[in-house]
Regions:
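Short beta->alpha transition motifs characteristic of CBS
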Residues: 62-70, 389-390, 410-413
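Short, surface-exposed loop or secondary-structure junction motifs
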Residues: 129-380
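Short, well-ordered beta-strand elements
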Residues: 393-399, 403-419
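Bacterial N-terminal signal peptides
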Residues: 3-12
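Sec-dependent signal peptide cleavage junction
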Residues: 12-23
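Short, conserved catalytic-motif segment at the N-terminal edge
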Residues: 27-88, 177-179
C-alpha cells in the first residue's frame, strides 16, 4: 500500500497527517484517502491509478498516490505502484508550461504579445476569411486565434507548419485549419491544440533553440523538475519508471469488465537506443523553427506529481521558486486575467460542452457558469487547466488570492467518454468524483 505524504515545511511525514492538523482536518484527510481508494477498488467504473495534492494557505498539506502505474494482466504480482515520482504524459496541462515559457520571452522583450505572429513565423499566417485581421500571440494563448485543429495538427519533422495553412500544402485539408466567417480572430473561442504547436514554433524562431531543449533550459532545470517534451531525453531505466496510460478498450471496442490495456508509453518491447523507438523520435534532421508540433507542445510533456506540485507552488508564490524568479508577478497576472468570456447570448465561443466559459492566456477560469463548475452545490472559483488524452485525466487549479490549490491525476478510463459524462458539469464522471472528494474534504470551508 502506498503512503500519504503530508508536508510540514520541507519535511515529508509518511504514514501520518501533519503534526499541527486539527482532529477535524485529520478526519477530512482520512476521508479523502478513502474516497480516492474507492476509485481504485471499483473494477468496472474505476481507474488504475490516482494521485492528488493540496496546497492550503501557501503550503503543501496533502499528497496521495494509489493504484498502479503498470499492470500485468497475466500476473498482478508484477504490477507496479503509481508514486509521486511516476512520470505520465500529462496531456493538456502541458499548455500551462508552454504559456509560461512564452511569457518569459515577452518579459525579455523578444515577443510582443499583441503583434502579428507572422512577424515571428517568417511567413504570413492569416485566416483567409479575415485577411485583414492579424493573429496575435494572445489569440493563440487564449484559443481565440480563429485557427482550428482539423483532422491533423501534428505533422512529421520534415514538413513546415506552412503545409497546414497554404492551399497547396499536404496537410491543408481543404482549409479545415481555418474557422469560418463569423468566428473572428480575437472574438470567438474554440479550444485548439494547434495553437500551441504554433507557439512552440515561435519559441524556436525567436530563441534559435529547439523547443524541447528550450523548455528544459528556461523552465524545468531552473525549477529542478525532471520533465521533458522529448521522450529521448529519458534513458531506458527512466522509461521503465514511466506510468502507462490505460483504457479498457482495444481498437475502439470497449469492455468495462475486461482488462486494462495500455494506450501510451508502453516501452516494454521497444528500446530507445539503436532500435525503433529512437527511429520514431529521431530529430537529427529537424530544422529548428519550422515545425515544433513534433514535440507535442499541446500535450506531450512527461512529468510527475512531484513536478506538478513544484509548478503549482511557483504559481501560488507569484512566480518564485525557492527564491528564484521564474515569472514576474505581472506575467502571472496577465495569464490569469480573463481574455475571453462567454457573452450573455452564448454566441462568441464553443464552450466544450459547457466546461469552458472564461479563458486567460493558457489558463482557464472556472466561474460556475452552466457546466463550468467543480461541485454541484458550492460555487468555488479557481483557475488552472484540465487535461484529457488516451485515458489520462488530470487537472491543476489554484486560488491565487487565498494561496490554495489542488492537483489530480488519473492514468486510465474504464469506459468510453460518451458514457461517462458528468452529472452536473462538463467534466467526466471520474473527475467529478475526484474533485468532489478533494474540495469537500480539503476545502470544506470554501
Amino acid at each position: 500500500m502506498l503512503t500519504a505524504f503530508i508536508i510540514c515545511g520541507i519535511i515529508c511525514l509518511p504514514c501520518q497527517l501533519k503534526a499541527f492538523a486539527t482532529a477535524a482536518e485529520n478526519e477530512n484527510f482520512a476521508r479523502l484517502n478513502n474516497d480516492l481508494q474507492l476509485l481504485i477498488d471499483d473494477n468496472k467504473n474505476g481507474v488504475p491509478g490516482v494521485g492528488a495534492a493540496v496546497i492550503k494557505n501557501g503550503r503543501l498539506v496533502y499528497e496521495k498516490t494509489l493504484g498502479s502505474r503498470y499492470i500485468d494482466n497475466e500476473n498482478t504480482q508484477n504490477n507496479l505502484p503509481l508514486t509521486r515520482d511516476t512520470k505520465l504524459r500529462i496531456a493538456s496541462l502541458s499548455k500551462v508550461f508552454v504559456a509560461a515559457a512564452y511569457m518569459q520571452l515577452s518579459e525579455e522583450g523578444k515577443i510582443d504579445l499583441d503583434a502579428d505572429i507572422s512577424r515571428y513565423l517568417g511567413f504570413t499566417l492569416r485566416n483567409p476569411n479575415y485577411p485583414d485581421t492579424p493573429i496575435t500571440s494572445k489569440m493563440l494563448l487564449s484559443h481565440t486565434s480563429s485557427l482550428r485543429d482539423g483532422e491533423v495538427y501534428t505533422i512529421p519533422s520534415k514538413y513546415s507548419l506552412q503545409e497546414l495553412f497554404r492551399p497547396e500544402g499536404i496537410f491543408y485539408e481543404s482549409g479545415a485549419h481555418y474557422a469560418p466567417y463569423g468566428e473572428a480572430p480575437g472574438e470567438f473561442f474554440c479550444y485548439t491544440n494547434l495553437n500551441y504547436g504554433i507557439l512552440g514554433t515561435i519559441i524556436e524562431k525567436v530563441t534559435q533553440t529547439r523547443f524541447d531543449k528550450y523548455m528544459k533550459q528556461a523552465i524545468f532545470d531552473p525549477m529542478e523538475i525532471d520533465a521533458s517534451f522529448n521522450i529521448t531525453d529519458f534513458n531506458e531505466a527512466a522509461l521503465s519508471d514511466f506510468g502507462l496510460i490505460y483504457q479498457k478498450q482495444e481498437y475502439g471496442v470497449w469492455n468495462t469488465d475486461g482488462p486494462w490495456i495500455a494506450q501510451v508509453d508502453d516501452y516494454s518491447t521497444l528500446k530507445i537506443y539503436g532500435n525503433n523507438l529512437y527511429n520514431i523520435y529521431n530529430y537529427d534532421e529537424y530544422i529548428t523553427g519550422t515545425n515544433a508540433t513534433i514535440f507535442f507542445p499541446h500535450g506531450g510533456l512527461r512529468i510527475s506529481l512531484a513536478g506538478l506540485e513544484k509548478w503549482m507552488q511557483m504559481l501560488i508564490d507569484n512566480g518564485k521558486y525557492n527564491g528564484k524568479r521564474i515569472l514576474t508577478e505581472k506575467s502571472i497576472d496577465e495569464m490569469f486575467k480573463p481574455y475571453w468570456t462567454l457573452n450573455e447570448t452564448k454566441t462568441n465561443g464553443d464552450t466544450y460542452s459547457g466546461l469552458m466559459n472564461c479563458f486567460g492566456l493558457g489558463i482557464q477560469n472556472v466561474k460556475n457558469i452552466d457546466k463550468d463548475r467543480f461541485l454541484p452545490d458550492r460555487d468555488i472559483e479557481m483557475s488552472g487547466h484540465f487535461a484529457e488524452a488516451y485515458g489520462l485525466l488530470a487537472g491543476m487549479f489554484i486560488d491565487r488570492e487565498h494561496k490554495n490549490g489542488f492537483i489530480y491525476i488519473m492514468n486510465g478510463m474504464s469506459g468510453p467518454e460518451s458514457s461517462n459524462s458528468g452529472a452536473y458539469s462538463g467534466m467526466y464522471s471520474w473527475e467529478e468524483k475526484v474533485c468532489s472528494a478533494i474540495l469537500n474534504n480539503a476545502f470544506p470551508e470554501l
